[in-house]
Amino acid sequence: MRLVFAGTPEPALPALRRLLDSPRHEMIAVLTRPDAASGRRGKPEPSPVAREALDRGIPVLRPARPNSPEFVAELAQLAPDCCAVVAYGALLRDELLAVPPHGWINLHFSLLPAWRGAAPVQAAIAAGDIITGASTFRIEPALDSGPIYGVVTEAIRPTDTAGELLARLAVSGAELLSATLDGIADSTLTPRPQPAEGVSIAPKITVEQARVRWDLPAPVVERRIRAVTPNPGAWTVISDLRIKLGPVRLGAASDLPAPPEPLPPGAIHVDRKSVWVGTGSDPVRLGQIQPPGKKFMNAVDWARGARLDPAARAT
């Protein structure tokens, strides 16, 4: 089939590369979000998908308004048979969806109808799910609600961050998307409607929502931190400094003894080998932390240099 690939960030690259290397399909263009400011100077940079396409000599489409009549007409001129989508980053309206005869086939990183929305991997980790996966489905106007072509499952490891889990799903999902498009081309796949039961929503996580709530139970705190690692990144405030946090360890999973006395939520205990913070249940041990303007470092090394007030709290 003649394909247009729509995607923007790094996790879309395995699928793009898999389809570019497929002898079954012809990639006629790549659709991605406009260049965005990056780095300290704020210089506009092409998306990871745009860079890959340009390196491969594939035309790149970067409309600011993909649903505009002008772009709908431009896409129609290309006459794609199908459009494959992985984390494009914009909602698509009926006029655009109607252009390719085989529709727009999306790779979504959850087992639909669970975790529809922009942050399915983060939501699955935060919820304590032990199994997740990826689904291919035909895009309809309602959010992630179209009929499903195929799924692949993936176990969530106890220490998985969102970045680590997403990297695995991007690879297994690339194979699923390729197989789905092959089946559509061969007329051997029939999509099935999503069940009405089991629907859950995973909206984008804001920076403010990534602030750690130390009043929650320790297992919830630990999962939530992994769920926003590396983006947008967990953070807290200690001694008026905004500190980014890497994954933490639960007391039961730590190889070091917990503080001798219970810690109220947000209270900090520093000993020779560890930094502990109280939660709504048991304390957690900090691992890597990032003070303002510095790189990630061991929490103990930072605490020694910072000379924390004994009354300092994480808030």
Swiss-Prot record:
InterPro entries: Fmt, Formyl_trans_C, Formyl_transf_N, Formyl_transf_N_sf, Formyl_transferase-like_C_sf, Met-tRNA-FMT_C, Met-tRNA-FMT_N. Keywords: Protein biosynthesis, Transferase. It catalyses: L-methionyl-tRNA(fMet) + (6R)-10-formyltetrahydrofolate = N-formyl-L-methionyl-tRNA(fMet) + (6S)-5,6,7,8-tetrahydrofolate + H(+). One of its GO terms (cellular component) is cytosol. Its EC number is 2.1.2.9. GO terms for molecular function: methionyl-tRNA formyltransferase activity. (6S)-5,6,7,8-tetrahydrofolate binds at residues 110-113. Coiled coil: none annotated. Belongs to the Fmt family. NCBIfam families: fmt. Attaches a formyl group to the free amino group of methionyl-tRNA(fMet). The formyl group appears to play a dual role in the initiator identity of N-formylmethionyl-tRNA by promoting its recognition by IF2 and preventing the misappropriation of this tRNA by the elongation apparatus. This is Methionyl-tRNA formyltransferase. It comes from Mycolicibacterium paratuberculosis (strain ATCC BAA-968 / K-10). The gene is fmt.
